[in-house]
Swiss-Prot record:
This is Arrestin-related trafficking adapter 10. It comes from the Eukaryota. Its main location: cytoplasm. GO terms for cellular component: cytosol. One of its GO terms (molecular function) is protein-macromolecule adaptor activity. The gene is ART10.
Length: 504
């Protein structure tokens, strides 16, 4: 009967996944039913990134008048590699002085403890990057990435093309035990037999903000002390790469068609800005204002309206954060903006009612290999409410419209009180710890894989009997951790001051 080998890992501190502060440790269990010759037993911690990209047929150039099949490009990056020997002990191993003679281990039950250091903050593949290496991030911005697509075998099925292309990238961390047998070598068995037992672990580093993927430009001052973000695309379609050059880091940020699978040569793609914003330089913490790229025209033919989301912290979300509750810093300040030469009475004569609300989370996963990038798009519905016009509490009141100073046109605003809706105020982000295609919800960037998210706020409007829709896209950094509690510095303990007498 073959020896039975198992790895029992100590659970992580949070009980769900290993993080940056965890020491990965455990026990190797070996059961032998008969004597076995063993040279050594080692346990290793390995991490690697693997990507496969393909070229679309329209970008494949024919050779000799013949159109060949699309080529594959593969990339492999080592992230971490540690090794511990648990048998024989160090003093015995040192005494052998290089002898290859095995140990004859008697039948029985054996346990060996092991422990690795904390995972480093930087991947080990960075030392192999040259100035011409094309990556999504520069060396200074690169951090140890989280596990991704650990169940890639279940996705790698040709009957579902979305999942098939999604499985082309993976980040795997594995603890593997290796037993080197000590059987004598012969001419027909020149190598020692190895017995291996791997166990994949899930690693997600501690929350840490990284540089935003959006390219922004400063365009003057705003009268209200806010940053204006305008989405230029109907879906998140940016594929940005970083190439180390002699003069510094060159950003390559192409935009492609709205496809679920895209392959291009990064050198042939144009640079395009996804967002524009304005900032009031005098404010220390300006509020950001995200608005629709395409406003809705009103029946008078000269006026328009759009939806704005104002927040300081909406670009970061933790698990179980409230999305609409007042004070959440997410969708608790949403406004309807009307621009034109309308007065209060003119706008009141127009029937404007919200009828439906939907909030989606857009996912963009990009893979890179040998200068060829592929993108995968998907959408997750976070919530949906119909029949808003029949609600007991209207979302906005036209009597609360107020004018905002403007040079050329009159601008009015009215708050859309999503925070007062009894259903929305209880909604928390990712309360059930949802796994999308086997992966928890989190954003990250690494050398050859990026996973980015954006909110998509859709509101259907009934304007004088016609149904129109506004769309607001907001890029967001998603963390799989719960928000850490605020650190409140405790006041020093009160000490009675010394007393002094008047006489000497």
């Amino acid at each position: 009967m073959a020896p039975k080998l198992d790895i029992i890992l100590h659970p992580p501190e949070n009980g769900e996944f290993y993080s940056s502060d965890d020491l990965i440790s455990g026990t190797i269990v070996l059961d032998l039913t008969k004597s076995l010759s063993i040279k050594q037993i080692k346990v290793g911690l390995k991490g690697f990134t693997e990507t496969t990209t393909k070229m679309d047929s329209e970008y494949v150039f024919p050779q000799n008048g013949m159109l060949g099949p699309a080529t594959e490009n593969k990339s492999y990056h080592n992230l971490v590699r540690e090794e511990r020997r648990v048998f024989p002990p160090d003093n015995v191993w040192d005494a052998l002085e290089g002898s290859s003679k095995p140990f004859k281990v008697k039948p029985g039950h054996y346990e060996y403890m092991f422990q690795f250091n904390k995972l480093p903050s930087k991947p080990m593949c960075l030392k192999n990057h040259t100035k011409k290496t094309i990556c999504f991030v520069s060396k200074s911005q690169s951090t140890m990435p989280p596990s991704f697509n650990t169940q890639w075998r279940e996705l790698n099925k040709i009957d579902n093309l979305d999942l098939y292309f999604y499985s082309f990238g993976k980040i795997i961390y594995v603890v593997e035990v290796e037993i080197e047998m000590g059987r004598p070598r012969t001419w027909f068995k020149p190598f020692d037999k190895m017995l291996r037992e791997p166990k994949i672990i899930e690693f997600i580093p501690e929350p840490k903000k990284f540089a935003s993927n959006e390219t922004v430009t400063r365009s003057g001052r705003n009268n209200h002390g806010v940053i204006d973000y305008i989405s230029k695309n109907n879906s998140s379609k940016s594929l940005s790469a970083m190439q180390e050059s002699e003069d510094g880091v060159t950003a390559i940020a192409p935009n492609g068609p709205d496809e679920k699978f895209l392959a291009r040569n990064l050198d042939q793609l144009d640079i395009n800005n996804d967002l524009e914003y304005e900032i009031e330089e005098t404010e220390e913490n300006p509020m950001k204002r995200y608005k629709c790229r395409y406003p809705l025209g009103l029946p008078d033919g000269a006026s328009m309206m759009w939806v704005e989301v104002r927040s300081r912290d909406i670009d970061t979300i933790y698990r179980q954060d409230f999305l609409f509750r007042q004070g959440s810093g997410n969708f608790d300040n949403v406004y309807l903006i009307v621009k034109g030469n309308l007065s209060f009475s003119d706008f009141s004569n127009i029937s404007v009612k919200p009828t439906r609300l939907q909030l989606n989370l857009l996912e963009t996963v990009s893979y890179l290999s040998q200068g060829i990038g592929n993108e995968n798009f998907s959408s997750l519905k976070l919530m949906e409410i119909d029949n808003l016009s029949k609600s007991d509490r209207p979302l906005f009141d036209t009597n609360e419209l107020k004018f905002i100073s403007s040079k050329n046109h009159e601008i009015m605003e009215c708050e859309i009180k999503l925070k007062d809706n009894p259903i929305l105020k209880r909604l928390q982000f990712n309360e059930e710890d949802y796994k999308h295609r086997g992966n928890r919800l989190y954003s990250f960037k690494t050398c050859v894989i990026t996973r980015l998210f954006s909110y998509q706020l859709l509101i259907d409007w009934n304007i004088n009997g016609q149904t129109r829709q506004t769309e607001t896209i907001i890029p967001v950094q998603v963390f799989a951790h719960k928000r850490p509690p605020p650190v409140n510095e405790a006041l020093p303990r009160y000490v009675e001051p010394p007393s002094y007498d008047d006489h000497v």
